[in-house]
From Swiss-Prot:
Taxonomy, superkingdom: Bacteria
Residues in the signal sequence: none
Pfam families: SfsA (PF03749), SfsA_N (PF17746)
Protein known as: Sugar fermentation stimulation protein homolog
GO MF term set: DNA binding
Alphabetized InterPro entries for the sequence: SfsA, SfsA_C, SfsA_N
Length: 238
């Protein structure tokens, strides 16, 4: 997917979960909106290079959005977790996710389940079972190992319960971990951070829920990030 026009700055601090202060090259201080409400472990330390977009909306209190971080080790992370669904949709449309490539119809944000949920994507195909796909963002990486979650996620636990129920009804059910960090080539669940989520995911796999994680690649033009896209399946370590 193509990124909007981005500007760079130096990260000063993140606070109140949704906000971050950055310094431009000319010394001006800006406050950015941060769409990622997680712990963002290792995704933004003071002094890192931040890339942000600017909205034309006149109603937004904070028109600038934190999009990416270039870490001191040279790796890049997409901070805007709203991009994960856009990335996944593009990958589904382009048949990049080979495990789901046989489906022709992609329905986003469909209400389902018994806990007042919405599935990220409902896939349909001729003579195929309906496939419920829940997308999660992977931004937490240690030693080239992608981890999810980076904080306790009761919402994620609810989604797993819903997927287990869909599988028991005869549908396909998938948890899709979309890489937003280009530094990992394997994936696992962060048991030490959310043991309840880890236990539920293990149960889901036993019930037949499918787990896939895909890596991400960033394109640059003249040292400026211009696009990102999902590339290939990475190993899932149970």
């Amino acid at each position: 997917m193509q990124l909007p026009n981005l500007q760079s700055a130096t990260l000063l601090r993140r606070y109140k979960r949704f906000l971050a202060d950055v310094e431009l090259n000319n010394g001006e201080i800006l406050t950015l909106h941060c769409a990622n409400t997680g712990a963002m472990t290792g995704c933004g330390e003071k002094g890192d290079t931040v890339w942000f977009s600017t909205s034309d909306s006149k109603t937004r209190k904070y028109p600038h959005s934190w999009e990416l971080t270039q870490l001191k080790n040279g790796q890049t992370v997409c901070i805007n977790t709203h991009r994960s669904n856009q990335l996944t949709l593009e990958a589904l449309q382009n048949k990049i996710i080979t495990e789901l490539a046989e489906y022709d119809e992609i329905l986003p944000e469909v209400k389902y389940g018994v806990e007042n949920s919405r599935i990220d994507f409902l896939l349909k195909g001729k003579n195929l079972p309906d496939c419920y796909v829940e997308v999660k963002s992977v931004t937490f990486v240690k030693n080239h190992l992608g981890l999810f979650p980076d904080a306790v996620t009761t919402r994620g636990q609810k989604h797993l319960r819903e997927l287990i129920a869909m599988k028991k009804r005869g549908h396909r059910a998938v948890v899709f971990f979309a890489g937003l960090h280009d530094g990992f080539n394997r994936f696992t669940v962060a048991k030490s951070i959310d043991p309840d989520y880890a236990e539920l995911l293990q149960q889901a796999v036993k019930e037949g829920v499918e787990v896939y994680s895909y890596a991400v690649k960033f394109d640059f033009s003249h040292q400026k990030p211009t696009a990102l896209y999902l590339t290939n399946l990475v190993s899932y370590l149970e």
